[in-house]
Amino acid sequence: MSSIVEHVVLFKLNDDDVDSGKINSMVNGINELVNLDQVLHLYCGSIHRLITTTASDFTHVLHSRYRSKEDLNAYAIHPDHVRVVKESESIREDIMAVDWIAEQAPEALAPPLGSIGKITLLKLKENVMEEAKLEIMEVMKEKFEGIDQITVGENFSPGRSKDFSIGSISYFRDLGEIEAVDDQMKLQNDKIRDYVDDTIVVEFNVPSSS
């Protein structure tokens, strides 16, 4: 498989006044969607760490993969997906989604069990040229030691992206591997800082058992 579609959704759930059972029900309902024919990989869970230059306070994350935009669209309108979305409306305070094409699919479509996912979303400054966008994505593709897989791409679904236009997701073996490359990633950020208006970084744990 040469390319895949990456689909990332960030949720802010109103967990202050909501029965935790409703949150668990939503998360479990989303994770059951992995059984749909269109889905190559899907995981939803709580955010371990959120780093952002704005006041965003998302609490949960969904990452899923598809063969094509058509499969993503079919997933979006599938009755099971529509039902889960409708059932969770009352506990969602905020939501955003970013989709991109990974031109080279990772060898393993499902990340290793027990690994740590790291999503980076960028909102670029106005009038950033196409050449600069390509440069940004090349910088973000740099694969440090400890990264099992990484994809980067330009968002093609602006409707719910809050103007974030570039996304990347990488999977590390554990938190220690992320901490080990912190300095390298800061240098990476310095290379693209002049083009970036806002950044959201999300880290989350992939369960150690399926």
UniProtKB/Swiss-Prot annotation:
Keywords, sorted A to Z: Cytoplasm, Plant defense
Keyword Ribonucleoprotein: no
PROSITE patterns the record matches: S_R_A_B_BARREL
Induction: Induced by salicylic acid (SA), jasmonic acid (JA) and infection with the fungal pathogen F.oxysporum.
Stress-response A/B barrel domain ranges (all copies): 5-100, 116-204
Source superkingdom: Eukaryota
Protein name as catalogued: Stress-response A/B barrel domain-containing protein DABB1
